[in-house]
Amino acid sequence: LVALGNVHWADGTRFDLVEIRKRTREVGALLVIDGTQSVGALPFNVKQIQPDALVCGGYKWLMGPYSLGLAYYGEYFDSGKPVEENWINRLHSEDFAALVNYESEYQPGALRYEMGEHSNFVLVPMLLEALKQINQWKPKAIQQYTAAITKKPIQLLKAAGFWVEDEKFRGHHLFGIRLPESKSIDLIKTRIRKDKIAVSFRGNAIRVSPHLYNNEADLLKLVKAVIGK
């Protein structure tokens, strides 16, 4: 089993999933992808990559609420045994009048992996509206926009001695800033908090996650706080 994200959760480094998929087939391994850090903001082609499973938390780039996620399962899992046992993932559970006829068989395909009470009347409509919005925005357009607003700020960071992965090997919606030895992470944190900038600190990286609600001025404000000028 090979399980990994489309991009690294700390600094946005992209993994070559096409080549990884090719290699997993050569050695007979399953490929399970965590799309939480990318799907919704970075295009993902299921037909091209053909993962055995793609799992996404709904609360990040899918713009949904906590407690919900989405998953795609390939043919390998069509007859699998789910982790969670409940009545609603059993065969014919949609026929409420016949629920007294207890079934031991699961629903076909991916339905067997649904959590109990998956017909959540509060959270599901929220996630559905979020997905409609993403389909209007389009992940490709999100990448193009975030690439445009981060280009100059990243150039300034690199010129000041900070490390950011080359754009060929990372997403534009998520990238990490790594510090030169001469810089103090504690001082940078103080400046960032003082300026009320929201970023994440993951290990020795400052994780930046711009979206359509940001602009270049937001990123330049961050650069000023990071560099200290």
Predicted regions and their residues:
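Active-site phosphate-binding strand-loop segment of PLP-dependent enzymes
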Residues: 1-36, 61
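Conserved PLP-binding catalytic core of the aspartate aminotransferase-like
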Residues: 147-154, 158-191, 195
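The feature captures the short pre-catalytic strand/loop hairpin that immediately precedes
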Residues: 95-113
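PLP-dependent enzyme catalytic core of the Aspartate aminotransferase-like
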Residues: 182-229
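Active-site PLP attachment segment
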Residues: 49-99
